[in-house]
Curated annotation (Swiss-Prot):
Location, primary (coarse class): cytoplasm
Topology relative to the membrane: Lipid-anchor
PROSITE patterns: LONGIN (PS50859), V_SNARE (PS50892)
Organism: Xenopus laevis (African clawed frog)
Record remark: domains: The longin domain regulates palmitoylation and membrane targeting.
Protein name: Synaptobrevin homolog YKT6-B
CDD domains in the cross-refs: Longin, R-SNARE_YKT6
Keyword vocabulary terms for this entry: Coiled coil, Cytoplasm, Cytoplasmic vesicle, ER-Golgi transport, Golgi apparatus, Lipoprotein, Membrane, Methylation, Palmitate, Prenylation, Protein transport, Transferase, Transport
Lipid group attachment sites (S-farnesyl cysteine): 195
Subcellular localization(s) per the UniProt record: Cytoplasm, Cytosol; Cytoplasmic vesicle membrane; Golgi apparatus membrane
Residue ranges annotated as propeptide in the record: 196-198
GO biological process: endoplasmic reticulum to Golgi vesicle-mediated transport; protein transport; vesicle docking involved in exocytosis; vesicle targeting
Residue ranges constituting the v-SNARE coiled-coil homology domain according to the UniProt record: 138-198
Covalent lipid adducts (S-palmitoyl cysteine), residues: 194
Length: 198
């Protein structure tokens, strides 16, 4: 599970422009990183341009998913992640980032803003924090703990069944042992009966 890009954009009347972004392109080769970053910016702008205001959607491109949230006030966010990353966590992140951005950056700066002029520096920390959704999102953490508990419970049940099979063997052996003990007792009793002292 990996996040590659987190962007905040403004959807204007005629054009979508980037306000701020953060990228993690460390998994790509050094010579591809700038091209990959440009492509992510282009894709983010294109997806926001084609999305309606007040909508959330996910777009699949090869092994990547682009999650977009365009608010009614024209502020938009895009997360680019791999297929394994939970979409719910992406939309939670987008909602949190856009809410924080809208409180820290004046609305009048959105239409004319650019990455150089917008003073908002939390995207890099959010991108690194949300790399592991279990650590960043409480719901994912609970789900992971439930999955682990289910695995432990399943393993415990399997070991109990194995132990149960061994207990069955012991029970059958004890039944055999009980029969032999009874036979031994009867035989011993018969032999000792001649030696009764009166």
């Amino acid at each position: 599970m990996k996040l590659y890009s987190l962007s905040v954009l403004y959807k204007g009347e005629n054009k979508v422009h980037l306000l701020k972004s953060a990228y993690d392109v460390s998994s790509f080769s050094f010579f591809q990183r700038s091209s990959v970053q440009e492509f992510m910016t282009f894709t983010s702008q294109l997806i926001v341009e084609r999305s309606d205001k007040g909508s959330r959607s996910s777009v699949k491109e090869q092994e990547y998913l682009c999650h977009v949230y365009v608010r009614n006030d024209s502020l938009a966010g895009v997360v680019i992640a791999d297929n394994e990353y939970p979409p719910r966590v992406c939309f939670t992140l987008l909602e949190k980032v856009l809410e924080e951005f809208s409180t820290q950056v004046d609305r009048i700066d959105w239409p004319s803003g650019s990455p150089a002029t917008i003073q908002y520096n939390a995207l890099d920390s959010y991108l690194s924090k949300y790399q592991n959704p279990r650590d960043a999102d409480p719901m994912s953490k609970v789900q992971a703990e439930l999955d682990e508990t289910k695995i432990v419970l399943h393993n415990t049940m399997e070991s109990l069944l194995q132990r149960g099979e061994k207990l069955d063997d012991l029970v059958s052996k004890s039944e055999v042992l009980g029969t032999q003990s009874k036979a031994f007792y009867k035989t011993a009793r018969k032999q000792n009966s001649c030696c009764d002292i009166m």
